[in-house]
Regions:
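Conserved beta-strand positions in repeat-built beta-propeller and related beta-rich domains
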Residues: 1-3, 39-41, 46-54, 88-90, ...
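An edge-strand/N-cap motif at the start of beta-rich repeat modules
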Residues: 1-21
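Structural motif
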Residues: 2-7, 54-59, 103-109, 152-156, ...
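Short loop/turn segments immediately following beta-strands, especially the blade-tip
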Residues: 9-16, 59-66, 109-117, 155-164, ...
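A short beta-strand motif characteristic of beta-propeller blades
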Residues: 19-28, 69-77, 119-127, 165-174, ...
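Beta-rich, blade/repeat-based domains predominating
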Residues: 26-43, 76-92, 127-143, 173-191, ...
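Blade-level signature of beta-propeller repeat domains, shared across WD40, Kelch, NHL, RCC1
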Residues: 250-286
């Protein structure tokens, strides 16, 4: 069982590096596994979900040791169930939490400063939306949401509410040679987003499989760059990190240094790639 903690490392840490600080202990309310974390540089806060307690936790940016969160969204009014993922819009001060309930996939939107047992300010979901309840990415610059939907990555307006269809869907397919984009992460100052994908036609995991992919060749995963204007079977403009990943889980960007960081569960590592092309504002195809 993993030790519940948020470990903070130096940006240039390499190899078997030691964390410079850790948020850990009973008061933190952290769970043994957390699949999403957001650093809000505007307000210097760390926001993440606790799936097991159906909560959203917010910590000070420089929190250390056994420190309690400064805000907790939790309770029956929230409607939260198994809150495994989230994204934050620090410009419009909103938190987006995808999940599944009895009616299917839905996105609950909360005020960023919400605390306690509070109702969401709006909900996005319904049969027409096709929302899976797995992931959501906010694009505050262009007022958009990138959401996992049936058949691909759906593009919605940020303020959409209720049973709304996506404006367009990026599907992957034989033309692009990729599956749908996943783990999307917007590139600031551009219309680009970085995401993970797999080779089109790669063998999917069995629904009953309990093991991870064992080799990079088996996983066939890599990182690509798409545009928010793409639709259908659109190819990525650039790709990197072929034949490296086993179980890539999440991405993060460092715009200042033009690098992409990827967490890999199978490798038990965080990998950093120089990827200056992803930060170009041009939309020419590869």
């Amino acid at each position: 069982m993993a030790h519940p903690q948020i470990a903070v490392f130096a940006r240039l840490a390499d190899g078997n590096a030691q964390a410079v600080r850790r948020i850990e202990g009973q008061k933190t309310m952290l769970a043994r596994t957390m699949h999403s974390i957001f650093y809000d540089a505007v307000h210097d806060e760390i926001i993440l979900p606790n799936a097991f307690s159906a909560a959203v936790l917010t910590f000070r940016g420089d929190a250390d040791g056994e420190e309690a969160p400064i805000r907790v969204i939790q309770g029956p009014k929230t409607g939260l169930l198994f809150t495994d993922q989230l994204d934050v819009d620090p410009i419009h001060n909103e938190i987006f939490v995808p999940m599944r309930n009895d009616e299917g996939g839905v996105i609950h939107v909360f005020d960023r400063g919400a605390n306690g047992d509070v109702a969401p300010i709006r909900k996005l979901g319904g049969p027409d939306s096709g929302i899976s309840g797995n992931r959501v990415t906010v694009d505050p610059e262009h007022n958009l949401l990138l959401i996992d939907v049936d058949g691909g990555l759906g593009i919605f307006n940020r303020e959409d509410s209720g049973n709304v269809k996506p404006m367009r869907i990026i599907t992957g397919g034989p033309k692009s040679g990729t599956t749908r984009p996943r783990e999307a992460f917007m590139v600031p100052g551009t219309r680009n987003f970085v995401a993970t994908t797999r080779r089109y036609g790669a063998t999917p995991k069995s629904q009953v499989a309990t093991s991870n992919f064992q080799t990079p060749a088996e996983a066939e995963s890599f990182i690509g760059v798409w545009s928010i204007d793409d639709e259908g079977d659109a190819p990525p403009r650039w790709t990197i990190a072929h034949n490296i990943f086993k179980e890539v889980r999440n991405l993060a960007l460092d715009p200042k240094n033009k690098t992409v960081m990827a967490a890999d569960k199978g490798l038990n590592a965080i990998l950093t790639f120089s990827f200056p092309e992803a930060f170009e504002s041009a939309t020419a195809t590869r």
